[in-house]
């Protein structure tokens, strides 16, 4: 009794099948598990830097229509929903401009009263503790300016670093606002250089959340182009690769 050898398919059939499965697996991975994002601005300095690349867990808060590519399955709300925690670094779609992704820190939960006085965040009338850890000169584009780094401690005990150029800039004093049900309030860690819920972004609906930022998988300082291979070892921030995002 002889075994017949399975006939191999021609390459022009095998190749499209391989591409189809590869694309399908990538879509499932990005839609339901982890999606990569890059950091284009300094609004989350010192936590995240321009040139950082990170993975966002899509399953952390459940799924909405924005979890899928191009919103191909339109539905409202979230399925398998899980409540985010104060202090999470979150990627979300900007309200009113849902084609734009933002990444900020969640500071206000539904029902919270949020305000900023003299640069200090207040939650439900209580000032959030912050302690200065360092200061130095930073490049903010056209000028070099003195900045202070603080460690901020939320009521739940979670800590993170923030950067302040001054305590009297345009968004360092805001009127108290109450976060509506089904919405969240976000701020950038670079408090004087962030478009967030204090202005422009406003309250973010729960269905606009994409996921929680987890860890960096790559980082570079932008000082080497794709073709300047000899500069890559000096442009890559090896100390940031694999760093978790707190």
For every predicted segment, state its role.
Residues 2-13, 28, 32-33, 37, ...:
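Soluble "head" domains of membrane/secretory-pathway proteins
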């Amino acid at each position: 009794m002889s075994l017949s050898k399975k006939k191999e398919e021609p390459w022009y059939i095998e190749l499209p099948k391989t591409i189809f499965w590869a694309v399908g697996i990538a879509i499932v991975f990005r839609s339901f598990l982890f999606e990569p994002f890059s950091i284009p601005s300094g609004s989350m300095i010192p936590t995240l830097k321009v040139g950082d690349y990170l993975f966002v867990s899509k399953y952390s808060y459940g799924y909405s229509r924005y979890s899928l590519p191009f919103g191909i399955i339109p539905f409202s709300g979230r399925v398998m929903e899980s409540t985010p925690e104060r202090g999470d670094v979150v990627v979300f779609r900007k309200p009113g401009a849902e084609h734009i992704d933002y990444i900020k820190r969640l500071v206000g939960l539904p029902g919270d009263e949020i305000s900023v006085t003299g640069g200090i965040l207040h939650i439900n009338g209580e000032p959030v503790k912050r302690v200065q850890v360092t200061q130095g000169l930073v490049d903010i584009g056209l000028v070099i300016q003195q900045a202070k780094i603080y460690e901020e401690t939320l009521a739940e005990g979670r800590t993170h670093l923030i950067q302040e150029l001054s305590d009297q800039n345009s968004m360092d004093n805001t009127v108290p606002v109450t976060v509506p049900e089904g919405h969240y309030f976000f701020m950038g860690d670079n408090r004087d250089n962030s478009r967030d819920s204090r202005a422009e972004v406003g309250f973010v609906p729960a269905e606009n959340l994409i996921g929680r930022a987890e860890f960096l998988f790559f980082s570079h300082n932008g000082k080497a182009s794709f073709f300047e291979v000899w500069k890559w070892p000096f442009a890559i921030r090896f100390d940031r690769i694999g760093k978790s995002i707190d």
